[in-house]
From Swiss-Prot:
This is Ubiquinone/menaquinone biosynthesis C-methyltransferase UbiE. One of its GO terms (biological process) is aerobic respiration. It comes from Yersinia pestis bv. Antiqua (strain Antiqua). Pathway: Quinol/quinone metabolism; menaquinone biosynthesis; menaquinol from 1,4-dihydroxy-2-naphthoate: step 2/2; Cofactor biosynthesis; ubiquinone biosynthesis. Keywords: Menaquinone biosynthesis, Methyltransferase, S-adenosyl-L-methionine, Transferase, Ubiquinone biosynthesis. Its EC number is 2.1.1.163, 2.1.1.201. Gene3D superfamilies: Vaccinia Virus protein VP39 (3.40.50.150). Methyltransferase required for the conversion of demethylmenaquinol (DMKH2) to menaquinol (MKH2) and the conversion of 2-polyprenyl-6-methoxy-1,4-benzoquinol (DDMQH2) to 2-polyprenyl-3-methyl-6-methoxy-1,4-benzoquinol (DMQH2). It comes from the Bacteria. Pfam families: Ubie_methyltran. It catalyses: a 2-demethylmenaquinol + S-adenosyl-L-methionine = a menaquinol + S-adenosyl-L-homocysteine + H(+); a 2-methoxy-6-(all-trans-polyprenyl)benzene-1,4-diol + S-adenosyl-L-methionine = a 5-methoxy-2-methyl-3-(all-trans-polyprenyl)benzene-1,4-diol + S-adenosyl-L-homocysteine + H(+). CDD domains: AdoMet_MTases. GO terms for molecular function: 2-methoxy-6-polyprenyl-1,4-benzoquinol methyltransferase activity; demethylmenaquinone methyltransferase activity.
Length: 251
């Protein structure tokens, strides 16, 4: 029984073999990549931009530093970090999904953001970078899709420089019960309909809603980061806890 538990994980509310989840998540993001930015604006009423700006403001990133935007998708954070680090710095936009990475590359190049940005297709559980390599790592709305989150957090810790910080921006648990009920109703009934109307894909957005519910809550994720080696781990609840920004340091 223990062995069986080790070999399975969740895909939304479903239990699947661990080796299957990566491919299933990949199909979701291949499907939604083309409409990803539009759907983000519609789903969050544009508030995701405020959450991301807060993340950048908390990053402490300075000119000349090296930043990893993990699960960076279409590059919203990468664009902001590119301006902060300047010509002497570097931002690596990494994503496991080829379609999302391609959309990010095309979007940033169309905006003229070139020169200090690199693109790497990478699995968060086994990052292909040297030890002590980055001044800052961010993962925005990506950790909940990772099969082995603890392994990914340890991998991030390894490639972070001493003195560096990790920022995890992710959906979390609303603080108030009325807000939680309203958010559930929106996520499970309205969100898939928006996905069907705009992206012709209700099923992928149903998975995204389920993946949010299965993601660890604020205190659990804080403990997971500490277990991975991060120190001074704190979090800020945003929009009533619908989203939380966790911060941890490597000393």
């Amino acid at each position: 029984m223990v062995d069986q538990e080790k070999e399975t994980t969740h895909f939304g509310f479903r239990t699947v073999a661990k080796e299957q989840k990566e491919g299933m998540v990949a199909e979701v993001f291949h499907s939604v990549a083309a409409k990803y930015d539009l759907m983000n604006d519609l789903m969050s009423f544009g508030v995701h931009r405020i959450w991301k700006r807060f993340t950048v403001d908390c990053s402490g990133v300075r000119r000349g530093q090296r930043v990893l935007d993990l699960a960076g998708g279409t590059g919203d954070l990468t664009a902001k970090f590119s301006r902060l680090v300047g010509e002497q710095g570097e931002v690596i936009l990494a994503d496991i999904n080829e379609s999302m990475l391609r959309m990010g590359r095309e979007k940033l190049r169309d905006k003229g953001i070139v020169g200090n940005v690199s693109y790497v297709q990478a699995n968060a559980e086994a990052l292909p970078f040297p030890d002590n390599f980055f001044d800052c790592i961010t993962i925005s709305f990506g950790l909940r899709n990772v099969t082995e989150k603890e392994k990914a957090l340890r991998s991030m810790f390894r490639v972070l420089k001493p003195g560096g910080r990790l920022l995890v921006l992710e959906f979390s648990k609303p603080l108030l019960e009325p807000l939680s009920k309203a958010y559930d109703a929106y996520s499970f009934h309205i969100l898939p309909k928006i996905g069907e109307l705009v992206a012709q894909d209700a099923e992928s957005y149903r998975y995204l809603a389920e993946s949010i519910r299965m993601h660890p809550d604020q205190e659990t994720l804080k403990g997971m980061m500490a277990d991975a080696g991060f120190e001074n781990v704190t979090y800020s609840n945003l929009t009533g806890g619908i989203v939380a920004l966790h911060r941890g340091f490597k000393f």
